[in-house]
UniProtKB/Swiss-Prot annotation:
Gene name linked to the record: 4CLL9
Protein name according to UniProt: 4-coumarate--CoA ligase-like 9
Cofactor(s) listed: Mg(2+)
Organism: Oryza sativa subsp. japonica
CDD domains according to UniProt: 4CL
A molecular-function term among this protein's GO annotations: long-chain fatty acid-CoA ligase activity
Amino acid sequence: MGDAAVPAMVVEEEEQEHVFRSRFPPVAVPDGVTVPEFVLDGAEAYADRVALVEAAAGGRSYTYGEVARDTARFARALRSVGVRKGHVVVVALPNLAVYPVVSLGIMSAGAVFSGVNPRALAAEIKKQVEDSEAKLVVANEVAFDKVKDAGVPVIGVGDRERMPGAISWDGLLAAADRTGAGVVPVDAAQQSDLCALPYSSGTTGVSKGVMLSHRNLVSNLCSSMFAVAPETAGQVVTLGLMPFFHIYGITGICCATLRHKGTVVVMDRFDLRTFLRALVDHRVMFAPLVPPVMLAMVKSPVADEFDLSDLALKSVMTAAAPLAPDLLAAFQRKFPGVQVEEAYGLTEHSCITLTHAAGDGHGHVAKKSSVGFILPNLEVKFVDPDTGRSLPANTPGELCVRSQSVMQGYYKRKEETERTVDGKGWLHTGDVGYIDGDGDVFIVDRIKELIKYKGFQVAPAELEAVLLSHPSVEDAAVFGVPDEEAGEVPVACVVRRHGAEEGEEEIVAYVAERVASYKRVRVLHIVDAIPKSVSGKILRRQLRDEFIKRMKPSA
C-alpha cells in the first residue's frame, strides 16, 4: 500500500495551538484490566510455548504456562509476607528469565514494581529504596551485598548460600502454594492504581520516581503495538538485551512480546560472541539495540567468525541514543535484509512515543533521519521554550505530548511534576524537535542536557555534585560529547581551589570511586573559570562546542 492510501496527519488548531495527531486511527484501550491481565491474556492457549529463555547455554527458560503460574504464586507470596496495595518492591536483578515473572507478580499483588540497576553502587540502590519507601527488595547474587543493608527485607533469587539472611524465592513460592490458588485479596489491583515506579533523571538531572498506573502502561502497549499483525501471534522472537530495570526493557520488550505470545531471548550483559550466537541459535527476528552494539556488528572481526547469511533477523530498533548516519549506512551494507528502525520514548510517557515503520499493510515508513511518526491515541505539539507558544510544522520547538500514557507525576515531587506536566495534561519532554509535512518527527537538540552513554542516562548535575565534594575542586561543569562507540561520553571541566595540586587523573579516580561505571568522567580538564549566564546557569553548550572545536584536527 502506498502513501497515497495512508490517511494524512491530523493537524488542529486547538485554542490557537498547533496540535498534531497520528495519521492512523485511534486504537481501543480496554477498561478495567491490569498490566498482568493484559499481558498474559490468552496464555493458556500457548501454555507449552517458550515465553522466556536465557541466551547463555543451559540458561533458565519459562513456558507461558509457567509464567502465568509463577506470576500468581509470587503475588500470593508477597501477600503472605505483608505486601499490600501501593507498597513498593524494588527489583535489583540483572536480565534473567525470571525478571518478568517477578515484576508481573508484584503488579498482580497490587504492589508497585521499581527496577534498579543491579550494578549501581550500594549507596545509589539504597537511595532509591529509601526514596521510594520500598517494603522489600528482590535481588540475586549480583546485587545482594549491595542491598542487604538497605534497611528492608530481601528476597533472594538464586544461590541461598551466597545470600545469608535473605528470604528464599523457592521457599516463598512453595509456601504460597500451601495458601491455595483461589485466594483473592479484597483490595485487588485496579487499572487506576500505580503499578510501576521507575526512576528517571527527567529534565532536571536529579533521579526521581515516575508514577505509572496500569492504565498508563496498557494504553502505551495498545498504541505501540497497533500495527502488529494478529496472524504473527506466537511467532516473533525478540532479543532481550536492553536492561529490564529500564521502562523500555520491561514494557517495550518483555510486556509487548508476552502480550503477543512471542519469545524473549534474555541476555544479561553484552558479549559479541554470545550475542551473535543468540541471533543464530534462537532465530531472533526483532532486536532492540543501542548504537554501540550495531557498531560492533559492523566493525568487529568477531562477526566474521559467524555465518550471518541466514539470520532470521528482520529488524533492529534503536531508541536509547541517536544513530549516526555513517553507522546506519555501514549496517545496511553489511545486513541489507534487516530493517533499521528508530524510536523515541521516555519514562514519563510509559515508554514508546514515536516510532518508525508501522508494519506491512500500514503504508507509511518514517524517514531514516527522523525518530518516527506519532502513534495512535497521542497528541503532539512543539512549543517555543521562551514564550510557550505552539509552533507550526517544520518549526523547531520543545516536544510536548499528551495521552493516556502520561505519568501520574513524580513521586513526592509536586513542584517538579507541575513543571513537567502542565495544567492541560501536556508532558514537556525537554527535547527540541519539529514535525514535517509528512508527519515525521525530528529531534534536533536536548534542553535537558542529559548525557546518553551507551544508552544509559548520565545526569551532569549528579557528576558535578560529586566533583564539588572533592576538597580541591572549587567549581565544576560536566557535559557530553559525541563518541563513536558510546554515543556520548561525560567530559568535565573543573576549577581547582587556590593552592590545590591534585591533577586530572586523581580527580577522575575520585569520581570513579563514587559512581557507577557508566557514569564515570572520561575526560577532565583543569580550567580557570566555568562560563555561566547572568542567572548563574552553567553554559554547557559553550563548553561543549569549545571542546569539540579543540578536538578537531587542524586543516
